[in-house]
Swiss-Prot record:
This is Nucleotide-binding protein BP2916. It comes from the Bacteria. Keywords: Nucleotide-binding. It holds the Pfam family DUF520. It comes from Bordetella pertussis (strain Tohama I / ATCC BAA-589 / NCTC 13251). NCBIfam families: PRK05412.1. InterPro entries: DUF520 (IPR007551), UPF0234-like_C (IPR035571), UPF0234_N (IPR035570), YajQ-like_sf (IPR036183). Belongs to the YajQ family. One of its GO terms (molecular function) is nucleotide binding. GO terms for cellular component: cytosol. Disulfide bonds: none annotated.
């Protein structure tokens, strides 16, 4: 039976490249000259360090631009509130990986409401869709692309 997986993943290498490019842009921008502003990547968490909260907002725009230039969907970003102290300001941006349980259930409910003859099941942070016809699976892909989810969805492992 044909099947495919619905995932929400970010390529670690592309993320590293985007953060490196954002750091390079910080070093060349006039409004950040002489400041200790930087991006630091640890796992899937990007930490922004700047002298003020205003500069953090500018840095977030730089990061968004670099992520989209590296074809990473910015909906995967979970931006925390900035932390300010006398030494400067910090802000953590978490890059979301995988489909959470609540969102997976919402996607399954949307698939069932469409009355397409497919089966869907949650496999950890993935969603496996199985159907008898390839056309049904393609209809589900079109449906999932239209749904309003705050995660970028990728479709992989399409088996016939």
């Amino acid at each position: 039976m044909p099947s495919f997986d619905v995932v929400s993943e970010v390529d670690k290498h592309e993320l590293t490249n985007a953060v490196d490019q954002a750091n390079r842009e910080l070093s060349t921008r006039f409004d950040f000259k002489g400041t200790n502003a930087s991006f630091e990547l640890e796992g899937y968490v990007v930490t922004q360090v700047a002298p003020s909260a205003f500069q953090l907002k500018q840095m977030l725009d730089i990061l968004r631009g670099r992520l989209s230039a590296r074809s990473i969907d910015v909906r995967c970003m979970d931006v925390a509130d900035p932390l300010e102290n006398l030494g400067g300001a910090r802000q953590k941006v978490t890059i979301k990986q995988g489909i959470e349980q609540a969102i997976a259930k919402k996607l399954i409910a949307a698939i069932k409401a469409s009355k397409v003859k497919v089966e869907s099941q949650i496999n950890g942070e993935k969603l496996r869709i199985t159907g008898k016809k390839r056309d049904d699976l393609q209809a589900v892909i079109a449906l999932l692309r239209k749904t309003d989810v705050d995660l970028p969805l990728q479709f992989e492992n399409f088996r016939d």
